[in-house]
Amino acid sequence: MAPKDIMTNSHAKSILNTMNSLRKSQTLCDVTLRVNLKDFPAHRIVLAACSDYFCAMFTNELSEKGKPYVDIQGLTSSTMEILLDFVYTETVHVTVENVQELLPAACLLQLKGVKQACCDFLESQLDPSNCLGIRDFAETHNCLELMQAAEVYSQKHFPEVVQHEEFMLLHQEEVEKLIHCDEIQINSEEPVFEAVINWVKHNRHEREKSLPQLLQYVRMPLLTPRYITDVIDAEPLIRCSLQCRDLVDEAKKFHLRPELRSQMQGPRTRVRLGANEVLLVIGGFGSQQSPIDIVEKYDPKTQEWSVLPSITRKRRYVATVSLGDRVYVIGGYDGRSRLSSVECLDYTSEEDGVWYSVAPMNVRRGLAGATTLGDMIYVSGGFDGSRRHTSMERYDPNIDQWSMLGDMQTAREGAGLVVANGVIYCLGGYDGLNILSSVERYDPHTGHWSHVTPMATKRSGAGVSLLNDHIYVVGGFDGTAHLSSVEAYNIRTDSWTTMTSMTTPRCYVGATVLRGRLYAIAGYDGNSLLNSVECYDPLIDSWAVVTSMATQRCDAGVCVLREK
């Protein structure tokens, strides 16, 4: 029989338990640690094995090498007791009350396990009120992973972080570093501007002189014209500073002179990277001339596509929205009939998740429009296989229930649905006889639909999305041609403007906004299905082709989802 090495899991634990018992009974102890006049008998070999600090003390030619007593400075006796317990038991009790003493002591005595336990504990305690302080604490003690975690947390929760006292007590240089960061996750620059103003007002006498310097890091050209005129222009701190007014004038010029935007590119016109948002493309009509169930994800940071779990049912003419961490795939056509069924995916970046069914709509709908308002999903129009619908219904995910709302004035399939300023807009489509240019808006407070200025071009199967207070409509079909043209609706003036056309005609195209840019995804160009994607940058009024999907398709659902 061949010899075999056998390892027992209990051996090391048994030795530690015995050594700890010997320590407590002061048996075979050969050194006493003295902390604030309190003595802690211990074993040199155990201390040296666990701590580089003690190993160097007892093996090098230091004065403490042969002494029976060693004075330890810089920590309390209660902290020393916790650390010795860890040395002999591998267990450390970390609390909110002791962590600020324990971590520096662990660093001093080079107890890596305690240091890591303290860092893990502090990371678990991060919240908007303490993340800035924890970051500074971590930096002081060279805890790089904790420092990075706290920094990322402050970026991810920026609007909440700046409401707390820790932010108000930052030095100017620390405020600059935070607001200069590309990675802070915000939906607009408004929280950044307001954070700067509030920080200055917290100690106006000392800080007012810092305002022009801080405002250089606020990307005011990316704010809406209304916010600039209604809020920034009215701020007394801005009005009494010539340097601040110059920065505001720059932002106004950016909006008033779009032809000059390409010359104004710089740090203040660069959209922040913000949240790790990804783009999902779901289902559609594929190259096999049938509905598909394929789901692809685009990450703008890597500019790469990947495949996610397929939906449970093949669908074209599908509507898709995201709400929180969930993606909803609504209605569509499976090749045999129009659908009322709805699928949902709970998604995080760490786990792809699985699709499951939620309550079906009251009406079967293909080519319906869908959008979200508050924490509700709204779906309107569509074709059920025999007629086009004027109806709209609303889904409440909290109770998993659909309810019918007021009808549109015109039946539509292939229309776009989008929310702007708390109002729902339905644009274009096909009524069974004509391609439409008309636009209706729904006021959720009154429950009524009304017409607004129609589009310049009639369109069905166009992509629709909201970008910088304008509703963009891209591509579609006008009854004769597949369109590459783009127009934008100004909500304030109730008027349309023709924008730069896409590089490719696209009907049944998906459209969505990601990181301040408008994406037009796939579609049909009149000859073939597309897998190409192009991206519109409003700052330079230009389209650029980005990485193509793996799958050629039209009629797909498109949405943007924020990864955790």
Swiss-Prot record:
Q: Chief location of this protein?
A: cytoplasm
Q: Specify the BTB domain's residue ranges.
A: 29-96
Taxonomic source organism = Xenopus laevis (African clawed frog)
Q: How does it assemble?
A: Component of the BCR(KLHL12) E3 ubiquitin ligase complex.
Q: Name one GO molecular function term.
A: ubiquitin-like ligase-substrate adaptor activity
Question: Gene Ontology terms, cellular component aspect?
Answer: COPII vesicle coat; COPII-coated ER to Golgi transport vesicle; Cul3-RING ubiquitin ligase complex; cytoplasm
Localization, per the record, is: Cytoplasmic vesicle, COPII-coated vesicle
- BACK domain segment(s): 131-232
The alphabetical list of record keywords is: Cytoplasmic vesicle, Developmental protein, ER-Golgi transport, Kelch repeat, Repeat, Transport, Ubl conjugation pathway, Wnt signaling pathway
What is the protein's name according to its record? Answer: Kelch-like protein 12
Stretches forming Kelch repeats: 278-325, 327-375, 376-422, 423-469, 471-516, 518-563
What the protein does?
A: Substrate-specific adapter of a BCR (BTB-CUL3-RBX1) E3 ubiquitin ligase complex that acts as a negative regulator of Wnt signaling pathway and ER-Golgi transport. The BCR(KLHL12) complex is involved in ER-Golgi transport by regulating the size of COPII coats, thereby playing a key role in collagen export, which is required for embryonic stem (ES) cells division.
Which pathway does the record list? Answer: Protein modification; protein ubiquitination
Q: Which gene encodes it?
A: klhl12
A Gene Ontology biological process in which this protein takes part is: proteasome-mediated ubiquitin-dependent protein catabolic process
